[in-house]
Design a protein with these regions (language model features):
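Conserved ATP-driven motor cores of ASCE-family P-loop NTPases powering translocation/secretion/packaging/pilus
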Residues: 2, 49-51, 74-94, 293-379
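Conserved P-loop NTPase motor module
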Residues: 4-5, 10, 18, 114-120, ...
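Pre-Walker A adenine-sensing motif
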Residues: 16-26, 216-218
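Residues at the beta-strand->loop junction immediately N-terminal to the Walker
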Residues: 25, 36, 48
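The conserved Walker
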Residues: 35, 39, 283, 312
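Conserved lysine of the Walker
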Residues: 43
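P-loop NTPase motor domains
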Residues: 51-61, 68-293, 363-364, 425
């Protein structure tokens, strides 16, 4: 960038060895990116720095908070010691300690707003990956979804799917030509997998009010992009498949719902996928191929995807080849295999005659990185050794009190916090049997609203969100079948409206 002062049109990463800013044009931020490095080298702080830059430019951010300290974005920084020294060496940074507009989410609803989707919205391909089904079990699941679509049975939560499977076991004639797919063994296996999923606490992910993507894209009152943080500190250890599947669903929904934007001065949304290797671990080939397609195509929808992991080798080559911005923190290499991997990382950068990237990789200190940006024409710049700019927010977690206050002051307070259990497959099928559905603990049935309620107020409530979801479900069924699976638009299905 030379002596030019960086602004919000630039995604500033830090300074080179001469103290000059290293940045990439914000309009190229939809070309995706990578933040990699060994544990303890500074990846989280780099992620924090990038999230701030996006927010300042008015770009929404969704990121997973794996260690629990990324939430420091919600409090102003207090730089001291080496951090203060680094800031002093970057006078062009215009550093100003400040908190950022953060919304906290938690699938379990403990450390943030509950985060939910429905089985119908997730689709059988992703659910099959979540349950780690065999091919025959996956076929049985598709057959069940097909019946649900034909019978008009909404699949919102796990009890809906269990009720449907039990119903098909007792009434196999409903499967028609697909009856051979739903054997006793496959049905029992599906029910066992669902029980295991419940034991992992995954049932909290499915239900209503479901997450509305327009809420993710909604800017803060001051025009900055809102930063949405998913507290995954518990989830990623207890149920890594649930964590990965939710992120895949989010990516698929964005691809399906967002219109084409073409070239723009900045993205709509930046997604940060921490522990990115989990997205590809034991992933069925069909799902991985679709994921690679979506990563390639979603940039035209204004979404930049940033993978955060220890080594670039954690990602498939087809995905790695699509990543424009690369921030590589230090790596350690002791074995011959690690040395080979290290060389591959160095070879992934455009060489800089000023230094040997391979040698530098093992010398980088905390908060240092090799950075490869894109030039204005979209071609790779020479790799630079960079001191990452400190974030303006707090480096470290919020206190419990601060977290509670942040949730209480959230613009989404009351919209997602209380679950709504409206009539769906479980209630319909229990009704056909003449049985009264059992109320789930903590899941009250939705009350019918008064006609005197204002429409705007109603649609902001949990019940209103459920109504919007119901309308969306009905539109989906008119436009496409539930068996579309993941990214149905890639397979010729209709997009959501």
């Amino acid at each position: 960038m030379g002596d030019k002062m960086p602004d919000s049109s630039q995604l500033v990463i830090g300074a080179d060895l001469a103290g000059q800013p290293i940045a990439q044009a914000m309009r190229l931020a939809n070309r995706h990116g990578l933040v990699a490095g060994a544990t303890g080298t500074g990846k989280t702080v780099t992620l924090q720095r990038l999230a701030e830059a996006f927010s300042d430019a008015g770009v929404a951010v969704f990121a997973a908070d794996i260690k629990g300290d990324l939430c420091g974005l919600g409090a102003a920084g207090n730089p001291q010691g080496k951090v203060a020294e680094r800031i002093a060496g970057m006078p062009w940074l215009n550093y100003k300690p400040q908190a950022y507009p953060v919304t906290l989410w938690d699938i379990h609803g403990e450390s943030g707003h509950p985060l939910r989707t429905t089985l119908s919205e997730m689709g059988p391909l992703l659910i099959g990956a979540l349950l780690e089904l065999t091919d025959s079990q996956q076929s049985a699941l598709y057959a069940a979804f097909k019946v649900a679509d034909r019978e008009g049975l909404l699949l919102l939560d796990l009890k809906d799917l269990k009720a449907l499977l039990n119903h098909l076991r007792d009434n196999p004639q409903l499967l028609g030509e697909d009856a051979a797919l739903m054997t006793t063994g496959s049905s029992q296996a599906l029910l066992r997998r669902l029980a295991t999923l419940e034991q992992q606490g995954a049932e909290a992910l499915f239900g209503e009010p479901a997450l509305q993507l327009e809420d993710i894209l909604q800017p803060a009152a001051d025009g900055r992009g809102r930063i949405h943080l998913l507290d995954a500190s518990r989830l990623v250890h207890e149920a890594p498949k649930v964590y990965a599947t939710f992120l895949l669903w989010l990516l698929a929904e964005l691809f399906e719902q967002l219109p084409e934007r073409g070239d723009a001065d900045k993205p709509l949304l930046a997604l940060f996928f921490d522990e990115a290797h989990l997205l590809f671990a034991d992933t069925p080939k069909a799902l991985q191929e679709r994921l690679e397609q979506v990563v390639r195509l979603i940039r035209s929808k204004g979404v930049g995807v940033y993978f955060v992991t220890q080594s670039p080798g954690d990602l498939p080559d087809d995905v790695l080849a699509q990543l424009g911005l690369r921030v590589q923190h230090g790596l350690r290499a002791f074995t011959a295999k690690e040395q080979k991997s290290l060389r591959a990382v160095a070879d992934g950068f455009r060489p800089n005659p000023a230094f040997d990237a391979l040698s530098v990789l093992t010398e980088l200190g905390i908060g240092e990185a090799l950075v490869g940006t894109l030039a204005d024409k979209g071609t790779p710049e020479m790799v630079q050794r960079v001191l990452v700019a400190p974030p303006q927010s707090r480096i470290g977690p919020l206190t419990d009190t601060e977290r509670t206050m942040l949730i209480a002051g959230s613009p989404f307070k009351g919209r997602y916090d209380k679950p709504v259990d409206r009539e769906s497959a479980y209630e319909v099928l229990m009704g056909r049997k003449g049985l009264a559905p059992e109320a789930e603990p903590g899941k009250p049935a939705a009350e019918e609203p008064s006609f005197t309620d204002k429409a705007g107020e109603f649609l902001g409530t949990a019940a209103g969100q459920a109504l919007k979801s119901a309308m969306r479900q009905a539109a989906n069924q008119l436009g496409r079948q539930l068996v579309r699976g993941l990214m149905g638009s890639l397979l010729g299905g209709s997009k959501r409206r």
